């Protein structure tokens, strides 16, 4: 196992215009302060205020948006980071681990990773993801990529259909089809930060949001040693070269994770579990009393000093005894949140320290709060109650189905852009209006300038005389559409769908 030295991981250099020379502790901290400014002032963060956490198109400001959720995750991440550093200081290990002059950057990387962790999520959350992937699967059929004979391939896009005698090209076709059918919010976050927003963050800061290490074009089983880390796609084919450079800069082995990402993940797990239940009470899906009984029933028998007793029962009893001065709802969730944090944060911090050799190497194949402990059971309790009583509620399911229909419908509306030939689309990009393609011209005008420029830049770097050129061009055209639609807020996607479907407002 390699020696633990965080100076080799907290890399303050950037992809472009990187600071040069040896830096003092204060200068390094200023570099990460610059990252904070770039992130907090980015449009991608602002858009989170109109993407909802559980309840799409919610008008009640007390119910969490992705932005308010991310701010809560940021605070919990800061708490865990400080707890880790405090414990390492007590153990007199800060200097041994190369952290004595990097405590500020350590905290900042964790905080900003937490704030950014949802920036790649499409409108309507997981149902938006599912809509994008299902729509592309119905056209590209990635499951036919190994089909024999090749004539069994059902892909409806001619340039991506497998052909006899073109094996090197067929392998690229397989990768592209698989990649496009595995849109994922975390992978889109990497694409946003590097390719679309060009935020030019430090290598360490980007490493903090590389939550999953599986390429989106991966086919087959994942290695058992990295099964958890490769649970979902973490980056696209379009960012393959950037991620290869990132791994080199952060000393990450293939499919390994950046150490501070485990802290961001734990902060998210702690935050959303309580928040989803609080939002459900705010939405009147159940009362606080009903929630307490759901939690009690799901946990089962327990001793007086059990974690359930110390966290949930304690919150319930305190909220009832103080109900005259403040509402039971506010009291209950205040105590539940405080009790949960006071138990889970120190536990997550100690798990990080206990497993630091594997975490530093990027190979710890678990979440910090997924083990056989009572702390893990408490998180599972919150999640299971939310799944059973919140996500399955008719109002929530109806909104999710509407969201799925909106995203599918928008992709269908913009499909003519994908149906154009390479030469026709190239002409449209150059001229921005083609008389013989009036519908396509108008659809193209609606695309964001930032996304169009990303497409143009990517295609301009391709050798136009290569047999791979038509494949890559179509890939980036699909990315253009996915970038545009996934970047919409819930409300904008809803309104855009209604406008283009000529539905009365």
UniProtKB/Swiss-Prot annotation:
Record HAMAP family: dGTPase_type1 (MF_00030)
Classification via Gene3D superfamilies: Hypothetical protein af1432, putative deoxyguanosinetriphosphate triphosphohydrolase like domain
Cysteines joined through disulfide linkages: none
Essential cofactor(s): Mg(2+)
Domain HD: 66-273
SMART domains cross-referenced by the UniProt entry: HDc
Its EC number(s): 3.1.5.1
Gene: dgt
Catalytic activity field: dGTP + H2O = 2'-deoxyguanosine + triphosphate + H(+)
The keyword Transit peptide is annotated on this UniProt entry: no
Listed name of the protein: Deoxyguanosinetriphosphate triphosphohydrolase
GO biological process: dGTP catabolic process
Organism: Escherichia coli O157:H7
Pfam annotation, one family: HD
GO molecular function, one term: dGTPase activity
Keywords in alphabetical order: Hydrolase, Magnesium
Assembly information from the UniProt record: Homotetramer.
């Amino acid at each position: 196992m390699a020696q633990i030295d965080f100076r080799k991981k907290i890399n303050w250099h950037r992809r472009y215009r990187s600071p040069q020379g040896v830096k003092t502790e204060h200068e390094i901290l200023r570099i990460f302060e610059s990252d904070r400014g770039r992130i907090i002032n980015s449009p991608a963060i602002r858009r989170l205020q109109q993407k909802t956490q559980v309840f799409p198109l919610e008008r009640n400001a007390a119910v969490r948006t992705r932005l308010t959720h991310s701010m809560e995750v940021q605070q919990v991440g800061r708490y865990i980071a400080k707890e880790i550093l405090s414990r390492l200081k007590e153990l007199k290990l800060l200097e041994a681990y190369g952290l004595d002059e990097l405590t500020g950057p350590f905290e900042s990387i964790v905080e900003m990773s937490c704030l950014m962790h949802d920036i790649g999520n499409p409108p309507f959350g997981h149902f938006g993801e599912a809509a994008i992937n299902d729509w592309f699967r119905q056209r590209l059929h990635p499951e036919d990529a190994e089909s024999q004979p090749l004539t069994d391939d059902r892909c409806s896009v001619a340039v991506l259909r497998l052909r006899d005698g073109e094996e090197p090209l067929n392998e690229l076709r397989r990768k592209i089809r698989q990649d496009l059918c595995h849109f994922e919010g975390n992978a889109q976050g990497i694409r946003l930060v590097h390719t679309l927003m060009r935020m030019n963050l430090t290598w360490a800061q980007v490493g903090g949001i590389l939550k999953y290490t599986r390429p989106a074009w991966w086919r087959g089983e994942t290695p058992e040693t990295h099964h958890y880390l490769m649970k979902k796609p973490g980056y696209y084919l379009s960012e393959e070269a950037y991620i290869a450079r990132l791994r080199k800069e952060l000393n990450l082995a293939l499919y390994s994770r950046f150490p501070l990402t485990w802290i961001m993940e734990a902060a998210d797990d702690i935050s959303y579990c309580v928040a989803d239940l609080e939002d459900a009470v705010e939405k009147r899906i159940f009362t606080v009393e009903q929630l307490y009984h759901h939690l009690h029933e799901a946990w089962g028998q327990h001793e007086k000093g059990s974690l359930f007793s110390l966290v949930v029962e304690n919150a319930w009893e305190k909220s009832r005894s103080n109900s005259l001065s403040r509402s039971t709802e506010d009291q209950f969730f205040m105590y539940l949140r405080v009790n949960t944090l006071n138990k889970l944060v120190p536990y997550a911090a100690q798990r990080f320290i206990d497993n630091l050799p594997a975490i530093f190497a990027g190979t710890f194949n678990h979440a910090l709060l997924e083990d056989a402990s009572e702390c893990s059971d408490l998180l599972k309790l919150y999640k299971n109650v939310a799944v059973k009583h919140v996500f399955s509620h008719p109002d929530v399911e109806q909104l999710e189905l509407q969201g799925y229909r909106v995203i599918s419908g928008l992709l269908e509306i913009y499909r003519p852009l994908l149906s154009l030939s390479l030469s026709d689309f190239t002409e449209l990009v150059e001229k921005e209006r083609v008389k013989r393609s009036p519908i396509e011209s108008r659809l193209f005008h609606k695309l964001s300038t930032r996304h169009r420029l990303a497409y143009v830049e990517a295609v301009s770097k391709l050798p136009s005389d290569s047999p791979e050129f038509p494949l890559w061009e179509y890939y980036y055209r699909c990315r253009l559409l996915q970038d545009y639609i996934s970047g919409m807020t819930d409300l904008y996607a809803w309104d855009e769908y209604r406008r283009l479907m000529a539905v009365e407002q």
